[in-house]
Amino acid sequence: MRSTMKMDKKNIKHWTVCLAVVLSAFTATAVNAAVSISDAEKLKSSLTPLGAQREGNGRDIPAWRGGLSMPPLEYKKPGQHHVDPFPQDKPLFTISAANMLQYQKYLTEGQKELFRTYPDTFRMPIYRTRRTAAAPEWVYENTYKNAIRAELSSDGNSLLYAYGGIPFPVLDDSSQAGIQALWNHITRWRGTFLQLQASEVAVHKDGNFSPTTVEQQVEFNYYRPDKTIEDLNNTLFYYLSVTKAPARLAGGAVLVHEPLNQANDARQAWGYNAGQRRVRRAPNLAYDTPIAAADGLRYADDTDMYNGSPDRYNWRLVEKREVYIPYNNYRLTSNKLSYNDILRPGHVNPEYTRYEKHRVWVVEGTLRDNVRHVYSKRVFYLDEDTWNISVADQYDMNGELWRVSMAYIKTYYELPVTWSGMDVFHDLQARRYHTQGMTNEEPEDIDYSNPPPGDRYFTPAELRRRGRR
């Protein structure tokens, strides 16, 4: 009995020490967390679960009421081309070069320049705003947890203690708010595993084009429901792409392992050359490395509007404002249209585009001293409901507006996830553009229905095997 009492005292002392360590660690985390618990609670009241302002503007931006999370009855199976849930919607008005000044308050500098560059043909049909953004409940729950635990490294280049949701849904008032917003884009919800066959197209000045068709598989390790922060192994996603056409490029393949902490681990990339039948490391597939299929119109970190390490720019949060951005673009991505219907000289056919007024976060990046990149400045407009970069204005080394990118967003209601259905990269100086993610002429759209194959699938050996098929 006496010896038991001695053991109990030892145990009490042991657990007291352990509890003190745990509490001190929790306190340190809370002090350094993005927001307080009371601020995080706003995600359940005045803010949406992903951090947007829940209420409307009292005029033409409605309140968010849960988004679009149920497919129309006509949508029957995974991978099916999306049925437009709003076929009855018509443009409220159309912005053109002739009336641009009337609406300039709600346009980005890049959009204004597109009107000036193509005054006779570029237009923006403005539709009723529908806040269709939605995500699964478990993503909302993880976003709440991230709000009170996620941190950035002191230089902002690494994300810590986040998993399975937006890391910074409530931006703080520090100098890191801009890079927090950028990390929200980098890690935003895009599904867990997807398979896609799509075309990317470089469109010449005269409108001629030749599609490059690729088959892609992406596993977003950060969004594996069966994972924890400890299980991520510093991996944001795995990406495997195999070129199917044209014949001169067919069989070429790329594999990417994308890290979360890019300060400690650089992106790992491999390329398979079908002609040589060899897999090689591709150490430079980042920053402003040109993408071969884009004919010089897209660089590595242009993909997905922005990706990769943020370390070459100083980022600042400029403001939140209302902007006309591409949204709910079901018609543009419909399989009822051919690429010939869509691709025109200078820009995509505006007859099939849809723009709506949404609130966006404006984030500006200026090139740091003693580093190189073709863009001296980048201005991103992030949709507040999803953290997607919807428009990107990018400047050359002379400070001139050079390139304008737009993501034609829609909600994949079968999951749900709100993401781009097609990205367009405009070179204003060359008067050319490049598109990525076109599926109009493919048998299917993105298929989210299969379980993730796991990290053992995304290997150089698999890259070689897939390239040979």
Residue ranges of model-derived segments:
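Bacterial N-terminal signal peptides that target proteins for export
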Residues: 3-19
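Long, C-terminal catalytic modules of enzymes
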Residues: 441-469
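Extended beta-strand-rich segments in extracellular/periplasmic secretory proteins, especially
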Residues: 197-245, 303-380, 390
